[in-house]
Design a protein with these regions (language model features):
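A conserved short helix/loop substructure at the end of the activation segment
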Residues: 217-228
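Activation segment/activation loop of eukaryotic-type protein kinase catalytic domains
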Residues: 103-143
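Conserved C-terminal C-lobe helix
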Residues: 203-219
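Conserved structural core of kinase catalytic domains
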Residues: 24, 36-76
């Protein structure tokens, strides 16, 4: 048995016979259901206390590790990641929950083909299409939406579709292989349109992923959608 990934709110342990467990620091039923009930992690089972998920796999790594191993960004990777994370997010939305923000360190990659969000500390409940922000966060914690950047006082509320913008940033990171676009966005407060311009000469243009990004990179959060068709 060995701990192969250790974060503040979860760790992944590898056992013999290709058995892995995800152990969360505290119960997170909504997030665990989004992994198991959607069959995102095939064959996964969970404990009654909603703190541990058990499954079989050959490899498990973070998205940051996965990207570091690749020689160049892949459209196929971006397509898989987008499809699977949208499925997970839509399940959470159905449960009246959402995700505050995404980061390559809170995404795991199973067998180089399954992508799952594990950042339990960023799963939050939706109240009348708003989410409650009660604690400070760093711009380095996750990809931050424009409305989160504007928060001056705590506690505060933002629209639940803040998650769509953050997910779109994660997809662009996967496509470009770096987060230079995000650093520029933070430094210059550039618009979502400016982020999309990073893809003007990319072969992703006019694909399903591209159109999802264009629907997610909208300044007014209530107008964003995550249709992946």
């Amino acid at each position: 048995m060995s701990v192969i990934i250790s974060k503040d709110n979860f760790k992944i342990i590898q056992y013999d016979n290709h058995i892995f467990t995800i152990e969360f620091a505290s119960p997170c039923p909504a997030l665990i259901h989004s992994l198991v009930n959607t069959k995102l992690i095939l064959g996964a089972t969970t404990t009654n206390d909603y703190q541990t998920v058990k499954f079989k796999a050959h490899t498990v790594k973070t998205l940051l590790q996965y990207q570091g191993e690749k020689t160049s960004p892949s459209i196929k990777t971006a397509h898989l990641l987008t499809s699977q994370l949208v499925t997970q997010l839509q399940y959470l939305l159905h449960e009246n929950s959402t995700i505050l923000g995404y980061h390559p360190e809170n995404i795991i990659v199973i067998n180089d083909q399954t992508f799952a969000f594990l950042g339990a500390e960023y799963v939050t409940h939706i109240y009348d299409e708003q989410i409650f922000i009660s604690y400070p966060f760093s711009h380095a914690d996750f990809f931050v939406s424009p409305e989160l950047l504007k928060i001056k006082d705590l506690p505060s509320y933002v629209h639940y579709k803040t998650a769509y913008f953050s997910l779109a940033c994660l997809v662009v990171y996967t496509l470009l292989g770096n987060h230079d676009f995000y650093d520029k966005y933070l430094q210059t407060h550039s618009s979502a349109l400016d982020i999309m311009q990073n893809l003007d000469h990319h072969t992703i243009k006019h694909t399903k992923v591209y159109w999802l990004l264009s629907r997610s990179f909208i300044a007014e959060p209530e107008k964003r959608t995550i249709l992946f068709i």
